[in-house]
């Protein structure tokens, strides 16, 4: 990744986010079910969809689950995989859409690495969360974050940048991982995180976030995840975490546990690179995090 893609708080991003904060989305009549893709006021190049369960009361604070799509941008399936979960828990689901190639340079992977050009994807997600609160008139506290494949790139790097915003995180089959490592530069390690993003890893806050890792035991393809010299995200040690997704996720588990984080690691028998199988395990994990649920009060 070019260093020019990682400069902290570019003028365009700061201006867009500042204007969004000054001009919140108007609160309209709250409806239940799925919304269309809603333009993000912080930066209309990006959008998000919500699932709102029925019978949310007044202006209460409710759980929020953010589900981040993979490389093919299946935002609807990312959202809908947690719809029944949301009904059970009285939770809202937010599924962002980070389109490929927003700068016209052929980069389809920018959101996975949190920044490209003037875009800070972590800040965009936080702007979407704030807009959703204003739009539907509900408050969210710390939220649950789930990501599969490309979305898992985003999820575990968001944990590094904003652990104080997370209630729990589920990381499913990422192609590459960033390890807590002060000796190696971003994105392989965290040495220059503070210079690039204005934040160093907050290990104390990270230890308060339960972490779920999930992958199929047949997720063994390597061609699409091997970094080669000259490729866009090549850097020294780019493949150091392992040859395939299973090995890389195991490296992430060991790294997080070595720094005191509580990690549940599911290896799913008979599954390859399978979103549905990983989402099922993620739902189980988040059920444990949120507790018994409130289905009688929130059933359709």
Give the location of each predicted region.
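The feature captures the conserved acid-bearing segment of alpha/beta-hydrolase catalytic domains
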Residues: 168, 173-259
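C-terminal catalytic histidine-bearing segment of alpha/beta-hydrolase fold enzymes
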Residues: 247-300
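Conserved hydrolase catalytic core segment
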Residues: 157-167
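Serine-hydrolase catalytic machinery in alpha/beta-hydrolase-like enzymes
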Residues: 44-47, 54, 60-141
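Short beta-to-alpha linker loops that shape the active-site pocket of alpha/beta-hydrolase fold enzymes
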Residues: 97-101, 175, 271
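A domain-start/cap signature at the N-terminus of enzymes
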Residues: 1-64, 146-148, 153, 162, ...
């Amino acid at each position: 990744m070019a260093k020019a893609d990682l400069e902290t708080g570019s003028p365009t991003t700061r201006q867009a986010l500042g204007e969004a904060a000054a001009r919140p989305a108007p609160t309209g009549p709250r409806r239940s079910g799925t919304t269309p893709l809603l333009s993000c006021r912080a930066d209309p190049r990006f959008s998000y969809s919500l699932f709102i369960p029925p019978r949310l009361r007044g202006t209460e604070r409710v759980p929020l689950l953010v589900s981040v799509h993979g490389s093919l941008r299946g935002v609807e399936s990312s959202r809908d995989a947690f719809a029944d979960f949301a009904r059970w828990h009285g939770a809202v689901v937010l599924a962002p859409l980070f389109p490929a190639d927003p700068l016209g340079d052929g980069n389809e992977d920018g959101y996975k690495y949190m920044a490209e050009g003037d875009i800070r994807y972590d800040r965009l997600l936080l702007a979407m969360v704030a807009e959703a609160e204003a739009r539907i008139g509900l408050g969210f506290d710390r939220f649950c974050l789930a990501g599969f494949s490309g979305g898992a790139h985003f999820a575990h790097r968001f944990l590094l940048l904003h652990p104080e915003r997370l209630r729990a995180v589920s990381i499913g089959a990422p192609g590459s991982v960033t390890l807590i490592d002060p000796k190696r530069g971003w994105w392989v390690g965290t040495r220059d995180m503070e210079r690039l993003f204005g934040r160093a890893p907050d290990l104390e806050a990270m230890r308060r976030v339960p972490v779920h890792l999930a992958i199929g035991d047949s997720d063994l393809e390597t061609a699409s995840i091997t970094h080669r010299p000259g490729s866009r995200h090549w850097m020294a040690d780019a493949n150091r975490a392992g040859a395939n997704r299973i090995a890389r996720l195991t490296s992430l588990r060991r790294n997080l546990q070595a720094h005191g984080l509580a990690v549940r690691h599911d290896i799913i028998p008979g599954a390859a690179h399978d979103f549905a199988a990983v989402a099922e395990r993620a739902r189980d994990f988040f059920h444990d995090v949120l507790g018994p649920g409130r289905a009688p009060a929130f059933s359709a």
